[in-house]
Amino acid sequence: MKNIIAIIWDFDKTLIDGYMQDPIFKDYNVNPHEFWTEVNALPKKYKEEQHVKVNPDTIYLNQFIRYAQSGKFEGLNNAKLKSYGERQNFYAGIPAIFKHTKEMLKNDPVCEEYNIKVEHYIVSTGFDEGIRGTELMNDVENIWGWELIEHEEHKIINEIG
């Protein structure tokens, strides 16, 4: 008998009201509409210019790196990305539902007998560090998001991990 109930969550617009990048845009005074308009044009641009098909859900990561390297996101590194986790606007009841679902089964005698438990996982095209910096992490088993590699010398985001 399997004893783990795995709950898999998306992050943006599922757990939070908006996008995890919103506080970054605000801090760096970058217009989110303009940023996403630029990003949404990239798949067509690369298809026409280089005959390359890019993933429209993740091409924004390259744009974030370009902005960091050009100074628009000056000093943006993994530590800063993690700190933005504290500024995410969770929907009402989140993160309490993470704790509640785990505790609920601990108090059930049948679940105790069979060691049935709930585990929470987050799958996102967002920044792993941004999620890692949230208050959810005490109740999340794992995250599948994007890791960014920092430039060794300049300590800003530089590559997709």
Model-based region annotation:
Residues 152-161:
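A recognition module on extended beta-rich or small alphabeta surfaces enriched in W/G with H and D/E
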